[in-house]
Every structure is written in C-alpha cells, then in structure tokens.
Amino acid sequence: MRSRCTVSAVGLLSLCLVVSASLETITPSAFDGYPDEPCTINITIRNSRLILSWELENKSGPPANYTLWYTVMSKDENLTKVKNCSDTTKSSCDVTDKWLEGMESYVVAIVIVHRGDLTVCRCSDYIVPANAPLEPPEFEIVGFTDHINVTMEFPPVTSKIIQEKMKTTPFVIKEQIGDSVRKKHEPKVNNVTGNFTFVLRDLLPKTNYCVSLYFDDDPAIKSPLKCIVLQPGQESGLSESAIVGITTSCLVVMVFVSTIVMLKRIGYICLKDNLPNVLNFRHFLTWIIPERSPSEAIDRLEIIPTNKKKRLWNYDYEDGSDSDEEVPTASVTGYTMHGLTGKPLQQTSDTSASPEDPLHEEDSGAEESDEAGAGAGAEPELPTEAGAGPSEDPTGPYERRKSVLEDSFPREDNSSMDEPGDNIIFNVNLNSVFLRVLHDEDASETLSLEEDTILLDEGPQRTESDLRIAGGDRTQPPLPSLPSQDLWTEDGSSEKSDTSDSDADVGDGYIMR
C-alpha cells in the first residue's frame, strides 16, 4: 500500500536501486529498509517447466516493474538476480534452469517499483521446489464410433525435480457424461517425454463424452474439460491429418508412375536389349523341367500317280500306211539298228519286205527267227569289204530311198541334225552296233521280209522276248536289210571294221562291233 511507504524514503530507495542495478548479488540486509508489499508467491510445474509466479493483494494499484532475487537458505550467500526476470512487467518467471536442487529451500525476494510515483516495495517468501504441484499436460481427443483416443503431449524434461515428481504422482483421466463422472482411468506413464495415447473404450454412439486430465497431487490442478459427441457412422482409425497425408502420397505415386510410363513409351528409358540366349533367364524353369512340345496339325497329302510316257523316236521305213504304229528307239538288250543312214531298196524289195506282220507272241517270233536264219544261210557269201558312206554318187545301181528317216520330236529340236543330201544323222549311244556284211550288191534286191529279220541273240538261249522295247508292249518290227555300201558308223571308221580286233562274227552273216 502507498501508505506504508514514506515519501522521504523514495529518494533513498531510488538511489539504492541505481547503485545496486549493476550488481548481480546483494546482501539480504540490503532490503531491510524497503517497506513490505503484501503478495502471494507460488511455484508450479507447467508443461514440464518450473514456473514461479506471484500476485499482489492490492490489485487496484498502478502497474509496476518486477525484479526477482533469490538465494539458497542452507547456504550463507548473497541474493542472486535472475536476468530474464529483471525489470519485467510479467508476474511469472521460469526458474527451471536456476533451481536444480528440488529438496532445497529458496529465499525469494521480489522488488516492486511502481511506475506511477516510483515508490519501491518488496515482497519475499520461502519456496521449496519439491512441493510444486503438477499441472496437466496439453492433450487432444479424437472420437470414433465406440471409443475415444486421448493423446497427451509431454515436452522434453531437463530437470530432475520434474522427472521425480511426475514418476511419483498418479495421473488421472476423468471420463464423464455431462456433469456426472462415468469413470476415472489411471494409466501408468513410463516415459514422460514425447506423446502418450490412451484409448477410452466401450462407449455409446450418439453420446456426448467429456474428458479431463490431472495429476492426483495436493493441490490437484485439473485441466479444462474437452467434450465430443460420438457419431454412429463415423469410422475409426484415421484422423484428418492421416487422410490428407495418404491422399498426398497417392497423388505423388500416380504422378511418378505416369511419368515413368510416358518416358517408357517415348523410348527414353527401359530400352530393350537383345541379349544372347545364354543370358536369357526368362524361361529358367523350362530348362530344368522341359515342357512337352505341342502337337502340330499335319495336312493329309494325297498322292496321285501319273504315268508319263517318254517321247520316242518314230522311224518309218515304209509307206504312209505304217505311220500310226509306234516305233521305239531301243530294245531291252541295248542294241539298235536305228540312227544309221543307207540307200533305199528297189520297188520289188519294198513290196516284199512289208513290215505289216509284227511279232506279237514269243512262239511265233521264234519260228520267224529260225526261218530268217535259214534264208540268210542260203545266200551267197559276199565280200567283207565295208560299203561306202552316204557321200557316194547317188547315180549308182540303187536309188536313194525316198522316205527319209523322220524324228518324232519337234522340227526345231533336230534341225541341227539335217545334213545335205537328205541324210539324217543320229547320235547312237550304245555299246555295240550290228552290221551285216553283204557279198553281192545284187542279192539285196530279192530279200524278203523274213530274210531281213535281225537276230540279236548273243547266246543260244536268247529268245525274241529280248527284242521287246523298254516301256512298250509291242515288239520291234523287222527292218529291211541294208547293203554294206550304205552302212556307216558315227565316227566314219567303217573301213577299219574288217581288220579291227573288236569285230566279232556272230553268225548268219552279221558281225558285232
């Protein structure tokens, strides 16, 4: 009160404050001359911090500035000023870092200077930090269909006084419906640092629940009530912050995946490398257990046999009446008389040597062969001199045959074989050629068809069946005998055939070369 402070002392106190303002410590007797100001000094643990607060009884007085001084009672020391609580207008001060001994008693002196008339007063008391009550921590509640999550936030604790106090003081969570207390929960808090969550279960939907926290201390400082109404359709599990976080994460993942897919389609990443089969482990299991190869559909193939007839040389030795008969080029035995040029026979020889009676059966062919052999033996022996080639004078006793040997192939193929003088040259690709040696040129005019039959038997057991043409059903018609002067070989060595060692006499006037 202003009445308790004399005006004369104002100047002295002001002088003392100015002198001691620069001092960190002063003796307790320095405040003996200050008048006392009635006040209340309290200490509490608020949010794990040791808070010293005071309150003046005369609340109607003018505002004032406060300076805090303290000292330990058990120690004979001077008063120490708290820097962060010097000349301040707040009525509280954090002394957590200053008062480290919980069981000690501290002497507190607060110098009060009124700003109106500059009167100085003091307010002092004895404080024990171990007796400081605990204020409840800050907390949040989240309601669900049938339960409530209570989350408490404990700041980091650096003072041993606070740690010991929180471990020894029971913690209470009061659950109430309206004004009636439903239940009190006393969870055991092992860790006083960080967040702690407690679940209130077995709650009724559509009900308004209120929650309050406090430490069961003397005096107990209770937190204000926080209420929530449980909704029946409200799902449990996630809060709004969790939903926002999940939504943001999904959007980031979608953007990342879309970017990767776009870059892959453009061709900037994930390029395909054609690795060798040795480094291809894509079908590694099939190497160990090979799969059965799938069956393949096979189309049926129908084979249609076709008989292709070979084109044969068609030789016509007689008139046009025999042109429709097929005359092959080779016999089964490999011998032929075709491909040789000679002079034609006379008219009498043409009429007598008609080839209209071909041999069709083996028995009749054998009889005719015997008859032809007998006729040939009756002929007078002719000299073995080989006849001249086709280049002799055509004005001789025999006229050239009018029917020229014709080829059954097209004219374009054998055009190169035609020679001057109506002579036709054929390539005879056989191992041997039979030539008949005539002793008399006049004797060939009266030869009959049976005498002109050629026997190609190389042994006594050969029959006329060897004369059948390969690939045909008919036998070769007998050929008219040619004079020795009209027979010639392909190489033009007919003159050396008489003296050649390779010529062999096969009988009946024939020699084989």
Swiss-Prot record:
Residues 377-389 have a biased composition (Low complexity). The modification Phosphotyrosine is found at residues 335, 510. The chain crosses the membrane at residues 243-263. It comes from the Eukaryota. Disulfide bonds join 39-123, 85-93, 210-227. InterPro entries: FN3_dom, FN3_sf, Ig-like_fold, Interferon/interleukin_rcp_dom, Type-II_Cytokine-TF_Rcpt. SUPFAM superfamilies: Fibronectin type III. Residues 421-444 are annotated as: Mediates interaction with STAT2 (and required for the recruitment of USP18). Residues 334-402, 458-513 are annotated as: Disordered. GO terms for biological process: defense response to virus; immature T cell proliferation in thymus; regulation of transcription by RNA polymerase II; response to interferon-alpha; response to interferon-beta. Residues 1-21 form the signal peptide. The keyword Transcription does not apply. Keywords: Cell membrane, Disulfide bond, Glycoprotein, Membrane, Phosphoprotein, Receptor, Secreted, Signal, Transmembrane, Transmembrane helix. Residues 344-354 have a biased composition (Polar residues). It holds the Pfam family Interfer-bind. One of its GO terms (molecular function) is type I interferon receptor activity. The keyword Membrane applies. Glycans are attached at residues 42, 58, 65, 78, 84, 149, 191, 195. Phosphorylated on tyrosine residues upon interferon binding. Phosphorylation at Tyr-335 or Tyr-510 are sufficient to mediate interferon dependent activation of STAT1, STAT2 and STAT3 leading to antiproliferative effects on many different cell types. Residues 22-242 are extracellular. Residues 264-513 are cytoplasmic. Heterodimer with IFNAR1; forming the receptor for type I interferon. Interacts with the transcriptional factors STAT1 and STAT2. Interacts with JAK1. Interacts with USP18; indirectly via STAT2, it negatively regulates the assembly of the ternary interferon-IFNAR1-IFNAR2 complex and therefore type I interferon signaling. This is Interferon alpha/beta receptor 2. It comes from Mus musculus (Mouse). The lineage of its organism: Eukaryota, Metazoa, Chordata, Craniata, Vertebrata. The gene is Ifnar2.
